[in-house]
Each structure stands twice: as structure tokens, then as C-alpha cells.
Amino acid sequence: MLKRDMTIANYDPQLWQAITDETRRQEEHIELIASENYTSPRVMEAQGSQLTNKYAEGYPAKRYYGGCEYVDVVETLAIERAKELFGATYANVQPHSGSQANSAVYMALLQPGDTVLGMNLAHGGHLTHGSPVNFSGKLYNIIPYGIDESGKIDYDEMERLAVEHKPKMMIGGFSAYSGIVDWARMREIADKIGAWLFVDMAHVAGLIAAGVYPNPVPHAHVVTSTTHKTLAGPRGGLILSAADDEDLYKKLNSAVFPGGQGGPLMHVIAGKAVAFKEALEPEFKTYQAQVVKNAKAMAATFIERGYKIVSGGTDNHLMLVDLIGRELTGKEADAALGKANITVNKNSVPNDPRSPFVTSGVRIGTPAITRRGFKEAESIHLTNWICDVLDNHDNDEVLANTREKVLDICRRFPVYA
């Protein structure tokens, strides 16, 4: 018989220890991975609810199982809040991840072998935008576009490629690009050749919801996102559109279920509903504005300390520190900062001579530190500590001293007070 007082700690101490250790790591380390964030206790409460027990194949009021009257309420709340948040007329909250949301778009709009124009992974794109190791690169004819010498997207080259290759779909969005994307220009190019415009806004969804980054929903035929990252919700995916095209909406729904998934994760959808409600609050706008302020402060400090930032700065939540020409790889920088309790990820940079497993750069983002309460002053201090470590990556004393500074600031700015 199941009892409410059953706990992991009493039943599985080995697993509980790993959970406890990870909780401590999150509190004692500064998180700068651009795709990570801290979700609210309310979201975690939803994810730990009895909604996890319910199968609900189909969509609200069109289920294949009985007993769905309450999960219909949950999913409808998530759908309506997502539409309100991004100005959409359609939302599908069932994708289990951003990648699965993206695969549903491919399935809905394309046939295998169709030509797709997507951002080069080496220039800041994403695996699902056409990488040869991903389903997108294996099933479709991918034409990559990239950035120019200034580190900005080259729209003239994008248009030239579009006219030459006439892709059936163009993809906007990125995983490591620090500029503002001109969604309207991309739609003009797509319309010129009669292509679908699909935008993956996963990295900047929170900024977009808060109005501090341009919204692609009015311009694209279809938009996808994750619900974590800057949006600070549970791990999951989302599909949106404002195309007022019921045929398109039906194709997208069918591509998610039954095309790519079975039963939705109702406990996660409840978490999404909570996160969307939180993102509609005024304080969320204040938070996202601070995310960008902190990123700009960090980028400026890196440059002052002699480090190169791809694109020369940032207009969003992330930046790429370019280590080409230095006697330090991205992998080594990642490891050295880890010893100082600062978590980043190694990342390839444009024209990187090193392999993706080594790289010549690190990607840094500010959503998580801003969630802790960091403002510009703390962000500048942190950047100087990072530069101290990078300048002295083989000096154990510098790493130890930096670690103590990190532990002190983490105590002053806890994740969960």
C-alpha cells in the first residue's frame, strides 16, 4: 500500500545522496551555462504532483482515455497562458523537449530530402537546425548560413543562398549567438522564395516574453521553444503560431500526437502552466531586463580584461569568449573554472581550429546568476574572477582563492532563500 510518508531518503539512500549532493552543488557553484536556470518551487510542486499518474493521449476534449476532465483544465490553462504570453493564436504544450518540438515542425511541413536553410552550428546554430549528426541533417538537404567577419548574421548572404537553393523552409534561432535577429528581414526572404519561416526561440523565449528581445511570433509561420532556459519553467517544449491557418495548426498537432509522441506528461504541462503564469507577472519583466544588463556588464568587463567576445558584445543573455590565439582551450578553461566552483561550457567559436570536444571558446549566460539576485556590480566582480582564473589556469592558489570568493557570494545570494 502506498503511503504519503514514503520518502527516497528512507528507501534509497544512495540515490538520495546523489540528489543531496546536486542540491549542494547548485547552491555552492555559480551557474553560467546559458541554457540552464533555476525553476520556482511552484513549478517543482506541479512536477511532483499526482498528475504524473494520468495518461491523456489526444488533446483537451478529444482524449483517447477516460478520466481526463481535470487534466483538460491543466492543459487548457497552459495553452491559453502561452498564447497570451507570446501573442499567438495557436499553442501546443505537449512536446517533451525543444528538439521534439522541432522534429514535429519538420514532420508537419516537409518531406525527407526537402531543402532547408539553417544556421551553421559552428556559427551559433543548433543541432536540430541541420547538423549532419542530427536527424535534421540526415533526413533533409541542409544549406547552412552563418555570420560575417563582424560576428553578425549576414542577411545578404542568407538571401543569396535562399534565392540560389530555394529551400522549402528557413530556420531562424540559435544556441550561441549574442546579437538581435531581424525576424522581419527573414520573413521577407522567406516570402520572396515561397518558403516556410520556422523560428526556434528556445534561448531567448524569456527575454521575448518580457519584451526585451524582438518577438518572432508575428513574423514566422511557426515558432518553437523550450520552456526552461530563460523562460525558467520545467524542462519541456512548446510550439506556437499566429498564422491564423487552421490547416497548419492541424498538421502541427498531428505531428506531435500521434506523429512523434504518445501520452503527454501532464505533470510537466502543469509546471509549464505555472511558469507561464509567473512569466506574465511584472517582476518577470524586471528579471529579464536585468539578465541583459548583467550580460552586457560581463561582456564589457571581458573586453576590458583583454578577452575577445564574438560579435563584439551581447544584446541578449549570452556571450562567447573566443580563446583562439591563447595557450588555453575551451576544455581547459571549463575545467579550471570548475575547480573554482564556476560552471560554464566549452563551446566552438567561428573558424575554430580545435575539435568540438576541445574547442577554442566558452559560452557564458546570465539567467541563473540573475535569478539568484546578481546585478551589474556582482556580475563585474564575477567576470574579473573568471579572468583571474583564465589568466592563471594552472595556478592552484588562484583557483582556491577564487573558490572561496565564489562560496562567499553564493552564501549571500542563495538559489532558494
Swiss-Prot record:
Family matches, as HAMAP family: SHMT (MF_00051)
Enzyme class (EC, first level): transferase
Binding site for (6S)-5,6,7,8-tetrahydrofolate: L121, G125, H126, L127, S355, P356, F357
Quaternary organization: Homodimer.
Protein name (record): Serine hydroxymethyltransferase
Site (Plays an important role in substrate specificity): H228
Family to which the UniProt record says this protein belongs: Belongs to the SHMT family.
Disulfide bond annotation, renumbered to this chain: none
Native source species: Aeromonas salmonicida (strain A449)
Catalyzed chemical reaction(s): (6R)-5,10-methylene-5,6,7,8-tetrahydrofolate + glycine + H2O = (6S)-5,6,7,8-tetrahydrofolate + L-serine
Organism phylogeny: Bacteria, Pseudomonadati, Pseudomonadota, Gammaproteobacteria, Aeromonadales
